[in-house]
Amino acid sequence: MQTILLQHATDAYGISSDFLIQDGIIAKRAPAGTLQDAADVVIPAKGLTIFPGLFDMHVHLRDPGFTQKEDILTGAAAALAGGVTDVACMPNTKPTIDTPETVQYILDKAAPTGVKVHPIGCITNGMKGESLCDYPALMQAGICAISDD
């Protein structure tokens, strides 16, 4: 079990605190300079802001179909490097995100990445603007929104 002590970190409300993190979970929070627990790693965080994780509502993972541009694994790694823990991926893939099978492909490929990927389903089949997708089936499969972007 790894323990990290962040000293004098500022939260989103501007409050300076010490944080004890055990196995990636905040175990304790105390006023800045007061937490004296032993830790494997001590990080002086004065001037730094701590967030539980950011959510990027508009990403183009391009997987399936355009993995030469981006794929779920590289997109997730880039997100984590920037403190982003959740992303909503746009449906302009090939095939487009207009079937439950494509939604499941994305969710399965994203599962081991450490990033929660929220697929956005198409409004219309193939993003062609001709016929509406089966929204109930897409929602049951796990989409978080719809778009023809």
Language model features with spans:
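Histidine-rich, glycine-flanked metal-binding segment
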Residues: M1-T3, H8-G53
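Hydrophobic "anchor" residues on beta-strands that sit immediately upstream
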Residues: T3, P52-L54, H118, C144-A145
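Structured loop/turn residues at beta-strand edges in well-structured enzyme cores
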Residues: I4, D37, G82, V115, ...
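Divalent metal-coordination and catalytic microenvironments
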Residues: A9, G24, G47, H58, ...
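Active-site-proximal flexible loops/turns
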Residues: I15, D63-T67, G129
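Hydrophobic/aromatic beta-strand patches that form the interior of the parallel beta-sheet core
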Residues: V41-I43, F55, A88, H118
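Metal-associated gating/positioning segment near the N- to mid-region
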Residues: L48-A110
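Histidine/acidic-residue-rich, glycine-tolerant segments that coordinate divalent metal ions
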Residues: T93-Y105, K109-D149
